[in-house]
């Protein structure tokens, strides 16, 4: 081991964003001092000096103790999308699920977060929702689409659960949405 870095939480996936493999985006979980997991965390690390790596920036999705967030990108690297926009700058596209444990369901979200990332910081550019409302529960067959994103001609196409959404990269406006049909036999439904 060349070096270590003490930070709260941990990254389960690291992605290099420069040619020297010294600037890394990390996706993982934030944790408190006791090690209890608090939710999704995106970090930017500088490993120019391997003996003394640094966390340059980090953001967490949670805004309060009654909120939980997660991303399939923490365990499925194909769910992670990096769009290079120049030297050490780009867009990070992640599938994100946010759940509020309160009666107010307005904090719930199921879709994708798009972050602007550079050495100067990490900022949320837009969110792309894959649900009609804050209600996650619905009747679908158990065949779900893997959480993926692609960029074509200035549009982000996101795939998650039972829908595909195309969103303009610059304006954030939804171009179209395709929903998988619900099964005719409602007895075979799975609810989540």
Q: Could you describe each region identified by the protein language model?
A:
Residues 1-192:
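Feature marking well-ordered beta-strand scaffolds used for ligand recognition
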